[in-house]
Every structure is written in structure tokens, then in C-alpha cells.
Amino acid sequence: MAASSELRLVSWNVNGLRAVMKKDPSFVGVFDALDADVFAIQETKLQEGQIALELPGYHQTWNYATRKGYSGTAVFSREEPLQVLRTIGAPEADDEGRVCALEFGRYWFVDVYTPNAQPELRRLSTRMAWDAAFREFLVGLVATGKPVVTCGDFNVAHEEIDLRNPDTNHGNPGFSDEERGSFGQLLDAGFVDTFRARHPDLAGAYSWWSYRGRARASNTGWRIDYFLVSADAADRVTGAAILSEVMGSDHCPVELTIEL
């Protein structure tokens, strides 16, 4: 087998791909500039056939929600996947297009858009069931013997350092004890938060800002977009970054470089 090579992986919640296509720079402009080996997106808000994206040199993998204009994920990869999985065994959310799991020759790549717990945590039970099923799904992929890289919008700020105003957000969606604990269980199951592993004390590093109240201008944000790797690949990570200068969505892209 050929020697491993450094891969550049990018994840971005675009909050509606059609909207980002119309912005300057457009999605394709950002995509071309970042020049990733694998580019994952979440919250495409598309139905099949609504757009035809021209990305020469990339294989396109899509997962659409049954409900129109909602959720959805996609992965654009230079390497052709050996297989693609689009469900994880979470009945209440498996029809929402939330996962694209691609098996490549050397590793698994899993793009995820985790269900939001919603105001008053009214969808928390669905969220907890999803987290448990996703954790079991990832552990199952690790058992195949290949390293696992998973990325996307996990809809949780894990620790107080991961959001600007933890004191006023305790118990809110994305910062409830249940969601934070569940994310901790995923790490305990053998996954590493790559950004925090490389930047353990870096405050003010966020990937999502509310559209309200000039939150992005004042950097009143949350870090809810992650790249996690299975423990067997942690020492292969060469870089982890948040690309906060990239506009077009209420999220910015996050990036991982890794030798696989």
C-alpha cells in the first residue's frame, strides 16, 4: 500500500445551500479556495434534483430529508467511496438526511447534522436517542479496523470555554447538562475533539453566531462544529482550525489536516 498522505478535510453548516450559492463569494468560490480533499456540508435544505452542482474532480454524496427545505447533508470527495451509509438506526431522525458515512480505502468519513433540542428542550428525547444511536454507529465503524473521522454540526458546546456566555446559557438548547454529558460520552467511547486537543486553552474560538444582535461582529458565539477522530488516529492529526473569516452562513467552516 502506498505511503499515507496528508488530507485536508473541511466541514461547513451552510444553512441553506441555495442561499449560499447566491452570495459573494458563492459556495463554489469558497469550495474552490479551500481546496479540500473532502468537503462536508450540513443543513443543505434541498430536495433531490433542486440544484446541479458542478465540482469537477469530486464525487458527490447526498442525503436528503423527507421534509422539504429541511436538514440534509452532503460530502464532496476526491476519492470515490467504497460504500455509503445514510441511516444509523435512529427512527425519529433517520428520514431527516442527517448522516453521510463514506468508507474509503484507508478510513471512514462521517458527516453529521445532529438534531437540535429546540426551545424548552422539547425535542431533547429525540436528541438523546440520536446521540446514543450515533455513538453506537461510530463504535461499530471503528470495529471494522479503519480509523474514523466524523465532523459536522453537533449542536452542542461541550465546555464553558466553547461559548461566549456560558452563565446565561446553562440549560438552554445546545448547552444543557444532558447534551453536554452525551457529547462527553462520545469522547469517552474513544473519540478525540481535534480542535480542543490542539488548542486546549484557546477561548473565543467559535463556529456559530446568532444572526441577532450583531453577534458575529462582537464574537458572541458558540463552538458547535467539530472534527472528531477515533483514538487510533489522534496522533495522525497535523492541524485543526476554525475558518471564522469565511462568511455566507451563520456558521463558519472548520478544518482538519490529518495523515491517513
What are these regions (language model features)?
Residues N15, K45, Y113-P115, N155-A157, ...:
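Catalytic metal-binding/acid-base residues of hydrolase active sites
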Residues K68-V84, R212-D235:
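Conserved beta strand-loop-helix elements of the APE1-like EEP
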Residues L7-L17, R106-Q118, C151:
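Active-site-proximal beta-strand elements of phosphoester/diester hydrolases
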Residues A132-T220, I224:
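Metal-dependent phosphoesterases centered on the DNase I-like endonuclease/exonuclease/phosphatase
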Residues G89-A90, P115-D131, D167-N172:
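Surface-exposed cleft-lining segments at the edges of enzyme active sites
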